[in-house]
């Protein structure tokens, strides 16, 4: 099962890189968590934009990003002072197959493939240190802390290859 998940992640990362690489953008897959770097770095040198991207894909209702992976993205972004616009992006891909359990057996049902690209701000500097960030299939995002989960509205980032962004109204509790 681990290899399937890992391959799913690599495929999603390569998909993002290949869609980003064009006349204006250059993107590279860096190897991710095993080497202490973001999954992907992308730059637009004409507009001085740098993206540090952490990518997650899966068949469940929720995808999670541990805080250490987000912190690595911020540490890389801080290194590049030349870039006027620097963003840490969490990329989430919910696959067409939704994994469900029936009588302790995994099964799949069909659903629409969706992708979200969320701009993450260094929220833990405001006193909340999350253990991880969670994104649900509907695009809602949450900080997971020792005290529980807090819904937070991270802005969508329009990737250069996206035609439109689906917006969701998120209510704070």
Residues covered by each model-derived region:
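Acidic-basic catalytic patches of nuclease active cores, encompassing PD-(D/E)XK
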Residues: 1-31
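Surface-exposed cleft-lining segments at the edges of enzyme active sites
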Residues: 3, 58-61
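Domain-level recognition of nuclease-like catalytic cores that cleave nucleotide substrates
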Residues: 3-7, 87-173
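Short polar/acidic secondary-structure junctions
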Residues: 32, 45-47
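Short acidic/glycine-enriched loop/turn segments that link adjacent beta-strands
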Residues: 34-37
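Short, charged, amphipathic alpha-helix that recurs within catalytic cores of restriction-modification
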Residues: 63-90, 112-115
């Amino acid at each position: 099962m681990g290899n399937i998940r890992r391959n799913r992640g690599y495929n999603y990362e390569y998909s993002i890189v290949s869609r980003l690489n064009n006349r204006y953008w250059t993107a590279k897959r860096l190897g991710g968590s095993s080497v202490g770097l973001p999954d992907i770095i992308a730059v637009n040198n004409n507009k001085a934009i740098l993206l540090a991207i952490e990518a997650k894909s899966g068949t469940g209702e929720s995808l999670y990003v541990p805080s250490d992976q987000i912190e690595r993205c911020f540490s890389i972004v801080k290194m590049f002072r030349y870039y006027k616009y620097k963003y840490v992006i969490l990329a989430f891909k919910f696959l067409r197959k939704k994994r469900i359990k029936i009588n302790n057996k995994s099964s799949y049902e069909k659903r629409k493939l969706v992708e979200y690209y969320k701009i993450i701000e260094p929220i833990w500097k405001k006193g909340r240190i999350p253990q991880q960030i969670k994104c649900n299939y509907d695009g809602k995002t949450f900080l997971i802390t020792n005290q529980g989960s807090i819904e937070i509205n991270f802005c969508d980032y329009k990737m250069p290859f996206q035609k439109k962004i689906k917006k969701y109204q998120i209510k704070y509790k």
